[in-house]
């Protein structure tokens, strides 16, 4: 399997502060091998799986595993904690404005050979996020102790194309990555 970029091309693009999506792919017709790989990877901290399903029964086109986020944004009240490879920074701000800006700035050109979800921000918004939009009483006890919002930026994705029986190994190198 060959990677899609030479070392010189990579260095040149990175020096220009460009996001890069490095990948390699191969045909993999035995799905049980893919399932075994996924079971292994899902044991990793901060990993996730997206399984596309149609009409609740039929397996959809893609199975996506994401792992090794280089940044995680946690929102609690008006404090955003940014965890970049274990170094945490806190920012006091209006979370929804910050998140909208974050999403707008996440603009990565995906190579044509890859599925469109080959680079992503992923996360969740809890029910309590409504309190950032509307003034409603907060009488609930926070017994779960989870962030109101969590967004992560996975460096690695493994995507299996169920139609083409092809697996993609993807490494996202973001412009702010030190190499």
Enumerate the language-model features and the residues they cover:
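Signature of the chorismate-utilizing enzyme
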Residues: 1-179
